[in-house]
UniProtKB/Swiss-Prot annotation:
Belongs to the AB hydrolase superfamily. This is Uncharacterized hydrolase SAOUHSC_02900. Its EC number is 3.-.-.-. It comes from Staphylococcus aureus (strain NCTC 8325 / PS 47). The keyword Transport does not apply.
Amino acid sequence: METLELQGAKLRYHQVGQGPVLIFIPGANGTGDIFLPLAEQLKDHFTVVAVDRRDYGESELTEPLPDSASNPDSDYRVKRDAQDIAELAKSLSDEPVYILGSSSGSIVAMHVLKDYPEVVKKIAFHEPPINTFLPDSTYWKDKNDDIVHQILTEGLEKGMKTFGETLNIAPIDAKMMSQPADTEEGRIEQYKRTMFWSEFEIRQYTHSDITLDDFTKYSDKITLLNGTDSRGSFPQDVNFYINKETGIPIVDIPGGHLGYIQKPEGFADVLLNMWG
């Protein structure tokens, strides 16, 4: 893996291929290896970069998180993630780059576009679970508060079951999300990673400071992506609302919420049609 030294962290990332830079931002998984099957499909067209977000995988913190980062209203980590992606983009290319964020990674991508538009050539939001600008935002904020409380008091298994039911996660995704790692060490790491995401991201990222105006001013750069196998899920409803209010197009893409793993060939074909 490659390394970029940043304030407070060593950011690690996979890099394959040649051509214009395309950065993938992972969601709850946090690690870029989840995009490697997709990267193989795109490496003849792009320099594909898949990031281990700060606090995940091989990326290392060199300074501790501030105590306030676990506050439900803290924007520290999502803003830090966005700054990391912008600094990575600048280190890799003198030109604006392509960016795709999936799930909570797409919320990071929104903050990249809002705060660092100069690094973005084109950007895609794949099934973002953000609620800040929705008419029923308070309802969804309260639901996420309840989910995190359940995880912390009743355990991860019960809380994640409620999470899946509340967001109407498709069976194809629920099965993959609940699949344990192959080794005991892997299962321990998986548990720690999911608990970290629960405490530091479910509430903070989904209710972070993004408005519809943040999209309309850059609408020519944005594509919304909804999976063909995750119809009816909350993240798709978010994209439908953005589309209705701004006119930014939605493109159907193969697979579900984890379509880049489930159907990497078809996922890549859509990206090449968009950006190739």
